[in-house]
């Protein structure tokens, strides 16, 4: 009897341990593995994660700091190229008579480039960071070469699609490099640090573009970066490959032959990659986001069958993906434990809110400043850069704050979200020519500081909730959630503008100019600034812009309210714990 009782007790104890193991969170399991085997790669991790761990286990502090410096240079080059491209693309448009084809390519490349981050994240884990980086650097360079050498809109469209896919992928992989080489406590500061090139390129980019326009051509403005990117980015990948080989030679990383036939390898990667789940999720995002972009550029209306059917099918595919991942996927595309995590859900909602807010008030902000405040191009550009520069500078300070306090949730909830709400709300009041522009600068600073807090906090939330394997996928998820919110914000801003500006303009114009209202509206800021400040026509135009901006700012302010419950969903993580192995910052 006693033996039976002891056996039952042992069985119950084992069952309790297994049950407890199932309830342990992913981040706790990851930390336990690091504490128990700090100098060994994680044996059950995917090969890409093992390579990243092996690199960190064999390189020195000097190599780590040098690599960070080189990553900063890569971000500087990437941001500089993007800034120059944003200015030179208008001169490229001028050379083609079929610009709408370029707009279609812009829509598709933006959507595809964003959605591809999910399979890229999976590829980095299954294959390796350096390998994926080299592939997409190649795609980026090929895209730039095609753009620089194209002879028409079709060639430009093809090149721009390749360019944008490569650009978003390379930017994403650089962020993953930083996550691999930083501890959780210092990661917020590391992320903010690599964003600081924006401060330089925000002002240098337009000047460089002007120099290219004055002394060269738009083709060379693109083409020269094919050379610069090759000699800047390839050495970074070779550094990671060098230390990976060093880890193999020292026995830290042992590559075991799989022994699989080509057919078995295909089946293995088909199962590990979860192609069905990847297809469902990518299709859901594409079908949902694409119609909003098509509407924004005038290719499809809200009432069209194309718009409605694509949005409905896209929305329905999200629960289909969730059901597949939960009950049918042999290997989950996104770990179910992360998929249902309240912190991850709240972070995705917040990302959508941030981008919805930004694109709602920002879409027509440039033209509003030019017309209502009669600013020249340079001063308008400086005004629109306040958010980028301000949020970047503040993010560095917030990164230091997180390092010292070891927490971020309360700061986002009680400082970041209220400050963004305050800035957006004050924009409602201080819009229009009757208000001094200094008040708008103040509002922009509030929004920038709030945004800098929330963006860094959002990234930290998903990374703190994930294990080492899940970090790339979580970064991709909040990026996609941001695209989700941004697409809706674009569409809402466009709808508000189209339904308020023409009517307000028609009401305000003198009777003898009412017949020109369509020309003034369709001509945009270029036609509107031709009317002298103080004239009846210019006053009517300013009033129309004020009305349009009022409703856009009201919408942007209202959506920020959702940030509070989204942040409240987060777990109040302590970042003073282990998430990565080896020598990291």
UniProtKB/Swiss-Prot annotation:
Signal peptide, first to last residue: none
Phenotype when the gene is knocked out: Does not affect the xanthocillin production, nor of fumivalines and fumicicolins.
Keyword vocabulary terms for this entry: Cell membrane, Glycoprotein, Membrane, Transmembrane, Transmembrane helix, Transport
Family: Belongs to the major facilitator superfamily.
Keyword Transport on entry: yes
Localization: Cell membrane
Provenance organism: Aspergillus fumigatus (strain ATCC MYA-4609 / CBS 101355 / FGSC A1100 / Af293) (Neosartorya fumigata)
InterPro entries the UniProt entry points to: MFS, MFS_trans_sf
Protein's GO biological process: transmembrane transport
Residues annotated as glycosylated: 341
Induction of expression: Expressed in copper depleted conditions via the regulation of the macA transcription factor.
Membrane topology: Multi-pass membrane protein
Role this protein plays: Major facilitator copper-regulated transporter; part of the crm gene cluster that mediates the biosynthesis of a yet unidentified copper-responsive metabolite. In contrast to crmA, is not involved in the biosynthesis of fumivalines or fumicicolins.
Gene Ontology molecular function, alphabetical: transmembrane transporter activity
Transmembrane segments: 64-84, 107-127, 130-150, 158-178, 188-208, 220-240, 275-295, 304-324, 344-364, 382-402, 410-430, 437-457, 473-493, 550-570
Annotated GO CC locations: plasma membrane
Protein name per Swiss-Prot or TrEMBL: Major facilitator copper-regulated transporter crmC
